[in-house]
Amino acid sequence: MQILNFVAAEIEPPQTVLGKVYQHDSVLTEEVMAYLQPQGGGIFLDVTLGGGGHSLALLRGGAARVVGLDRDPAALQAAQARFAAEGIPGSRIQLWHLNFADFDLQQHGFRDEQGQGIPFDGIVADLGVSSPQLDCPERGFSFRGEGPLDMRMDPSAAQETAADWVNHRPVEELIEIFTRYGEERFARRIAHHIEQARPLATTTQLAQVVWQAVPPAARRGRIHPATRVFQALRIAVNRELEALETLLAQAPTWLKPGGRLAVISFHSLEDRLVKWAFRRDPRWQVLTPKPLSPSELERQRNPRARSAKLRVAARSSQM
């Protein structure tokens, strides 16, 4: 199967992608399948393909065809190899190297005999950063290992990196993003320490600056003091909340009447956007008044799933 809108030279060889670097367990898969109900056939859109777990579950569950999107070239190649190993024919899966905020039904979806984009029966979005991205120091998403301050979901994209943000943005702007995207109460202290320590090149350098910036009492918690700063920078670099707002606004136009959108979020900023969009937009009918969380068994098997929340809504027939 072909990856569309894609240059193969942008990414690492398949053996690297399929090894330790790209092993990812999809979260809340059973719950997503229960709401999207692929057993009846139909076509589905996976806007955050990752390692292909949700798409594969849809195809195994009876979906006729799936369109998969991802910004990360490594994720696309890993998923492509996984589908091939599972014997999924290319006619059932269409992959795009694409930010879901840029998806266009006519251009990127399946088409009918008249050449018109076919609306989907369901859409799944598994937001945030994946385990392979976190576990690869070269991607710069985590301070657990030393790597460049990158944090781009698409390393091939011509966009600012986290290093560009911490080294060149005004202090007041850093304070704003640490507060808004990281809900960091020591944002001002941290931003001023970053200004004094510039230039910063690696994840561990930034983590050490944050550690020194916060009061000693804040260093003794279960969560490392740099966690919220790294989250804020990642969200800012990739414009994640803006992309999510676009998805929530556009998804009703990509769905058939009654088609469902399942969104998995991992922090309160994302969940709040999903919750209010589902409640306030008359095009949505909420199917999960309260978000679903992973079972105890899933949390034990995959500790990173513990903060996941699933919300589902159906496209109203009144549009």
From Swiss-Prot:
<dbReference type="GO" id="GO:0005737">
    <property type="term" value="C:cytoplasm"/>
</dbReference>
<dbReference type="InterPro" id="IPR002903">
    <property type="entry name" value="RsmH"/>
</dbReference>
<keyword id="KW-0489">Methyltransferase</keyword>
<comment type="similarity">
    <text>Belongs to the methyltransferase superfamily. RsmH family.</text>
</comment>
<dbReference type="GO" id="GO:0070475">
    <property type="term" value="P:rRNA base methylation"/>
</dbReference>
<keyword id="KW-0808">Transferase</keyword>
<feature type="binding site">
    <location>
        <position position="100"/>
    </location>
    <ligand>
        <name>S-adenosyl-L-methionine</name>
    </ligand>
</feature>
<keyword id="KW-0949">S-adenosyl-L-methionine</keyword>
<feature type="binding site">
    <location>
        <position position="133"/>
    </location>
    <ligand>
        <name>S-adenosyl-L-methionine</name>
    </ligand>
</feature>
<dbReference type="InterPro" id="IPR023397">
    <property type="entry name" value="SAM-dep_MeTrfase_MraW_recog"/>
</dbReference>
<keyword id="KW-0963">Cytoplasm</keyword>
<feature type="binding site">
    <location>
        <position position="70"/>
    </location>
    <ligand>
        <name>S-adenosyl-L-methionine</name>
    </ligand>
</feature>
<dbReference type="GO" id="GO:0071424">
    <property type="term" value="F:rRNA (cytosine-N4-)-methyltransferase activity"/>
</dbReference>
<comment type="function">
    <text>Specifically methylates the N4 position of cytidine in position 1402 (C1402) of 16S rRNA.</text>
</comment>
<dbReference type="InterPro" id="IPR029063">
    <property type="entry name" value="SAM-dependent_MTases_sf"/>
</dbReference>
<feature type="binding site">
    <location>
        <position position="126"/>
    </location>
    <ligand>
        <name>S-adenosyl-L-methionine</name>
    </ligand>
</feature>
<dbReference type="Pfam" id="PF01795">
    <property type="entry name" value="Methyltransf_5"/>
</dbReference>
<protein>
    <recommendedName>
        <fullName>Ribosomal RNA small subunit methyltransferase H</fullName>
        <ecNumber>2.1.1.199</ecNumber>
    </recommendedName>
</protein>
<keyword id="KW-0698">rRNA processing</keyword>
<feature type="binding site">
    <location>
        <begin position="52"/>
        <end position="54"/>
    </location>
    <ligand>
        <name>S-adenosyl-L-methionine</name>
    </ligand>
</feature>
<feature type="region of interest" description="Disordered">
    <location>
        <begin position="289"/>
        <end position="319"/>
    </location>
</feature>
